[in-house]
Structures are given as structure tokens and as C-alpha cells.
Design a protein with these regions (language model features):
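Hydrophobic alpha-helical membrane segments
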Residues: 1-304
Length: 304
């Protein structure tokens, strides 16, 4: 019988333990369904492609000036946010499928998310606009602008933390998606903060360990053959960083989905049975349900 981790503490080690448990359980989902790593990989590839495409236009726009650089930046922010959200939504859909005992499919999850393109476009437009506002405030010489940006950034992060699960699982409008994401964060703020701190710390630790291993593995080769050894070191470190990025994004996607499913459905995914969701944000009265309904996938906007 699995030991359930109580999650009500707010200290450093409590949050680290919370993050470790969620990371471990999420990694278990990745172990059983490694294809989930494909979604952040595709998101990263598309982001790099568009960064390359927009590099020259950005340089030219900065030379021309007159605000043209913000127009090009808006376009870049929009397309990168769109594809990042699209593949993140597909990951959330696939994770939910895995939570309910079915084998997720990359193609089927992407096909399912095609029905949510409208909300994704709306979100991408709003996100790109906010990013431009952030950039304007960042470039301002007014000290008050920096303070406003910092405060706004915190509020924006909180309000949009669950935006992707909301887009996937609910029929939402441009305003209601933010209301639903914000209310879900409010209901799970304790675990969300704990998970955020713990998962980030643990993934960074894993990344550092992988980089150290990569360097250690290349040292003997570099000692004997400096040229090839240096190339090997660069390649291994790059692979370690890419894997760390994929792991981080996938773990976050799975953990967010688990938190959302519990917060909205009262159902504990079986892959997280050793984690005590009953104390989410101190809401001990919101116990996870068990029984026949626990194997039922939540009704989603896609399925309606």
C-alpha cells in the first residue's frame, strides 16, 4: 500500500517534499508513456524555427524604428505562443487520457486539440499583447514602470497558471478562461506554490547532475583527443540540457493536469495515489472521490 504524502506544510522542506512527490509521480507517467516527451519537443522545434524566421525582420525593424519593432515582436510572440499552447494543450489531453487508464496517442491528442483552436488563438493574441506591454514597461526609463511590470507579471502568472487545462477541459470565452484559471489557482494555491518551488528545484538539480555526467564522460576523450573531445563535450551537454528542458515541460504539464483534475473533478489520478490531494490549499474538506466515477475521464469541451 502506497504511503500518501501529506501536503499541507508551507516550509522549505515541505514544499521540496511536495515537489519531489509530484515530480516522481509525473516521472512515473512519463516512464509508462514516454511519447509524452514529444509534445514539448515539437513546441521547442517550432519556437526555434520561428525565432530563426523572425531574426532578420527583427533586426531590420530595430534599424527602421518608429515602433515597427513592436509590430514584428507581436507577430513573433503570437506564433510562438500559439504553437507552444497548442502542443501544451495536446500534452494535457494526453496526460488526462493516461490518468484514466488508456494509452495516449500523439496524433489523437493533437487531433482533439484541433477543436480548441479558437480559444488558443484568442489566448495567443491576448498573451502577445501582454508581452508587448511588458516589453514597453521594461524599456521604460521610469522606475515606476519597473515596479508596475513586476507586480503585473506576478498577477499575470497567477491568473494564467491553469489557462491551458481550462482551454482543454472547458468551453470558455476570452474573459471566462482567465476567471476559471484564476479560480482554479485560488482553490489550489498551496499545492501550486509548493509544486512550483519543488519541481523547479528538483529539475534544476537533475539538469546539473546530467551536465556534470556529460562533462565527466567527455574528459577522458578530450584529454587524448582535444578537438573531438571538445565537440563530444558540447554535444553531450547540449543533449543533457535538451532532455532537462523536455523533462521539465512534461512534468509541469502532467502535474498541472493532475492538480486541475482534482480541483475540478474531485478525482485523484491513480498515478498520484501516494500524494494527498485532500489538503490542496488547506481545503481538507475537499476529499478525492473513489469508486466507479474515479475511472471516468472528466467531461471536456472536446468531448461535448
Amino acid at each position: 500500500m502506497a504511503t500518501r504524502t501529506r501536503s499541507g506544510g508551507s516550509g522549505f522542506f515541505d514544499r521540496l517534499k511536495t515537489g519531489w512527490t509530484l515530480t516522481k509521480d509525473s516521472a512515473g507517467v512519463i516512464r509508462d508513456h514516454p511519447k509524452l516527451l514529444v509534445f514539448p519537443l515539437l513546441a521547442g522545434i517550432f519556437s526555434i524555427i520561428f525565432l530563426v524566421i523572425f531574426f532578420l525582420p527583427l533586426v531590420l525593424a530595430n534599424v527602421v524604428g518608429g515602433g515597427l519593432e513592436y509590430v514584428v515582436l507581436f507577430a513573433l510572440y503570437f506564433v510562438t505562443t500559439f504553437f507552444s499552447t497548442y502542443f501544451s494543450a495536446a500534452l494535457v489531453h494526453a496526460a488526462n487520457v493516461a490518468f484514466h487508464g488508456r494509452e495516449p496517442s500523439v496524433r489523437e491528442s493533437m487531433y482533439a486539440i484541433n477543436g480548441r483552436l479558437g480559444p488558443i488563438v484568442v489566448w495567443s493574441l491576448i498573451s502577445a499583447t501582454v508581452s508587448i506591454v511588458f516589453r514597453v514597461l521594461e524599456n521604460s526609463d521610469n522606475p515606476l514602470a519597473s515596479v508596475m511590470r513586476a507586480v503585473f507579471a506576478v498577477g499575470w502568472s497567477i491568473m494564467t497558471f491553469f489557462i491551458v487545462p481550462v482551454i482543454v477541459f472547458e468551453d470558455v470565452t476570452a474573459t471566462s478562461m482567465f476567471e476559471r484559471s484564476g479560480s482554479t489557482f485560488k482553490n489550489t494555491w498551496g499545492e501550486t506554490l509548493g509544486a512550483g518551488f519543488g519541481i523547479t528545484a528538483i529539475v534544476i538539480g537533475i539538469g546539473i547532475a546530467l551536465v556534470v555526467v556529460a562533462l565527466a564522460a567527455s574528459v577522458p576523450v578530450a584529454a587524448a583527443f582535444p578537438g573531438p573531445g571538445t565537440v563530444l563535450a558540447v554535444v553531450l551537454v547540449a543533449l543533457a540540457l535538451v532532455f532537462t528542458f523536455l523533462l521539465s515541460q512534461t512534468v509541469w504539464g502532467i502535474a498541472k493536469t493532475a492538480l486541475y483534475v482534482y480541483a475540478e473533478e474531485g478525482v485523484t489520478p491513480k498515478q498520484f495515489e501516494n500524494f494527498d490531494f485532500e489538503t490542496l490549499g488547506g481545503r481538507a474538506e475537499h476529499a478525492a472521490t473513489t469508486g466507479p466515477d474515479s475511472d471516468r475521464a472528466p467531461r471536456t469541451a472536446i468531448e461535448r
